[in-house]
Amino acid sequence: MLPMNPKQMKKMMKQMGIEMEELDAEEVIIRTSDEELIFRNPNVSKISARGVETFQIVGEYEVVKRPPKISEDDIKLIMEQANVDEETARRALEEAGGDLAEALMKLQE
């Protein structure tokens, strides 16, 4: 493919109904169930074509693990089964990644 200057490329994209916009983003965070991908100072492009908007994110990112979600019912169960206070039960569940059996085993050692 022949190299094309940016102005020609933009004109051609516009003729095809594709619009591209650079966004001045400071940070982008993508959250999954167990981690966050944090992009600081990314290059973000918004591409609109045929009524669909697509975002392109380019840059370095950091992966941060999210703490497990621990329900009050889980805490109460651990408190009853291991005969411990709420703080101890919560800490055991956090250390066990929310795994009830592992938290109980650690407390019963």
Curated annotation (Swiss-Prot):
Pfam families with a match to the protein in the record: NAC (PF01849), UBA_HYPK (PF19026)
Signal sequence annotation: none
Record-annotated NAC-A/B domain positions: 3-70
GO MF annotations, alphabetized: RNA binding
Keywords annotated in UniProt: Protein transport, RNA-binding, Transport
Gene3D superfamilies listed in its UniProt record: DNA helicase RuvA subunit, C-terminal domain, Nascent polypeptide-associated complex domain
GO BP of this protein: protein transport
Highest taxon above the source species: Archaea
Alphabetized PROSITE patterns for the sequence: NAC_AB (PS51151)
Record-annotated disulphide pairs: none
Family: Belongs to the NAC-alpha family.
Assembly with partners or alone: Homodimer. Interacts with the ribosome. Binds ribosomal RNA.
Function: Contacts the emerging nascent chain on the ribosome.
Protein name: Nascent polypeptide-associated complex protein
Upper classification of the organism: Archaea, Methanobacteriati, Methanobacteriota, Archaeoglobi, Archaeoglobales
Gene responsible for this protein: nac
